[in-house]
Amino acid sequence: MLSLKNVSKRFGGIKAVERCSFEVEENTITSLIGPNGAGKTTVFNITSGLTRADSGTIKLSGNDITNRLPYKIAQAGISRTFQLTKIFKNLSIKDNLLIAKKTNYDEMKKMLESVYLHKPLDTIASELSYGQQRLLELARALLKPHSLLMLDEPTAGVNPKIRQELKTILRNLRKEGKTIFLIEHDMDFVMDISDEIIVMAEGKVIKRGKPSAVRKDRKVLEVYLGK
């Protein structure tokens, strides 16, 4: 589905990402984790078209999408949510959803129910809590035509209730055959829901495997947890 091969990026003299290679398999939840400064956000931005890679290739379903502009990435089939939400806070829930797709009342209500956002469609987005705004952004991303759903730090700033709801939402999407790529800092969260976990540190992939293998890996414990 998604393939990164030898992707590298420098900012001045700093190596943000160095020869990063991994794959996100179809119909899986794959999570990219690591400590602050590991390079996760840079990988997300490069894959989203927000930052240009210095070298390497990125492919989606076999098609080269390396260094395409963000709207071209979306057209290729990647739908995204961001750590800092990109919803329009001055617009209603309905209008935010209509930006993603011209749809009808029933489809919008069904989508909101699927992400546990039980609010009237005419509610202004600024009246929602931060966690509810994250859910609205997720609903909007799901409405867009896509083959890959990519989420940047979906648990950041949300309360325990929404955090648990996110687990259920992602599990349900997985059962529906969705392909999901998470960028996360919360190891416990991804351990519960991921088919595969990729661990980064200092710009490099240091471990890739099933949650049970990652949890026991000594290098991961040393680098990520400081043990």
In which residue ranges do the predicted regions lie?
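Glycine-rich phosphate-binding loops of nucleotide-dependent enzymes
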Residues: M1-S3, V7-K227
